[in-house]
Amino acid sequence: MVDYQFYQNMVDVIIPDVLRSIPNALTQAIRNFAKNLEIWLCESMVGVPERLSQIKTSAVSAFCQTLRRYTSLNHLAQAARAVLQNSSQIAQMLNDLNRVDFHNVQEQAAWVCQCETSVVQRLENDFKAALQQQSSLEQWATWLQLVVDSALEEYRGKPNYAKAARQFLLKWSFYSSMVIRDLTLRSASSFGSFHLIRLLYDEYMFYLVEHKIAEAQQKTAIAVICDRMRTSIGLEFDYQLEFIDDNIESGSAAKRMKHE
């Protein structure tokens, strides 16, 4: 669809690199633009056929959501960059991470996510090595890209690629949450730093997977986001209908009992 390509081009121009520092004034301007664009479009579409209006509105909604997400991701990236450049904080993080019970984490990950022990072990070792080397944010981003590529390689060109990609996100999130849980229980001094890093890496993983799915489906990322939004709205609508039907049936049953 032309609208998707147009808005994707706009995203690529406005935020060409989600990790590169953006001035605060520009970030605020982008957010204000995203906040008002949908309103402006709706006002300009008065009298337009409903179907055309829905198509235009869904595309611009995906565009605005993308701008909001990418500016939030960029904000996290700049906050995390400060942590990753602080050698004393990195040393504390490595010290706290070495106390985590990774054997327990791996056992639970294997049971819940069916993650291979060798893969989980490799991720642990790579993460610790990157901390020890005081890797830059860009180096971390390269590693995350390699993790995604490695995890999805066997599904390349297969019809279940998108499903596998979403499953990978769930597994990644569960595994990282187990590590954060252990750090919390141990009252780790660097918990705040780990929490920030985890937020950034989760969001960046989502960003990477979204683009991998778009590439596999030969679509723009905006189109993938729009598809997801439509699916979400459809599920919510189905739930509402089911809720209404249940209430109607309950009401009818109550009336019958009353008459009886």
Regions found by a protein language model. Give the residues of each.
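Acidic-enriched, low-complexity/disordered segments with a strong bias for Aspartate over Glutamate
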Residues: 3, 12, 17, 96, ...
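Short amphipathic alpha-helices and their capping/turn residues within compact interaction modules
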Residues: 15, 19, 42, 72, ...
